[in-house]
Amino acid sequence: MELTHIITGEAKKPLQYLSSCEAVKGKGLKGDRYYNKTGTFNKPQLDQSVREISILPYESLQECNDRLDSSLEFKELRRNLVIKNFDYEKLKNKEFQIGTAIFKIVRTAPPCRYLSKLLDEDMMKGLKYIGGYRAVVVQSGLI
C-alpha cells in the first residue's frame, strides 16, 4: 500500500494536491472542507463521522476514465487520499497507518450526483463500485 496523492480544499472550489498534511482525530485533514465543516454533505441530518477522510484506490481513476472515455485527474474525483495497491479486504475492520496517523475504514464512498453535476460527466457510471471508501482518523498524525 502506497500513498500517492493527498488532496484537500474548500467546498465548491477546485481541490489541490499537497505533499503532506495533518490528519486530526474526529475532524479529518486539516484545511479540508470537511475538517472545516463546510463540505457539500456537512448537513446536520447526515452522519459526519463518515466524512472525515475519503480514500480512492489509485487504480480506480484509469477504470473511471476508460468507462467515460475521459481524462479526469485524481483531484477532480474529490477524494482525500489516493492509495496504490489498496486492499479493502485486508483492511476491513482493521486500523492502518499512513505516516504517523492511524485510520479505519467505516464504509464505501459511492459516487454522487453532485460530482456528476460538477464535472458534467456521468460519475454514477464512471465510479460505480469503485468510488472508494470513507475512513475515520483513529490517531492524529502527519501524512
Model-derived segments and their meaning:
Residues I83-Q139:
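Glycine-rich active-site loops that engage anionic ligands at enzyme catalytic sites
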Residues M1-Q97, R107, L142:
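Electropositive, beta-rich accessory/interaction domains or terminal extensions
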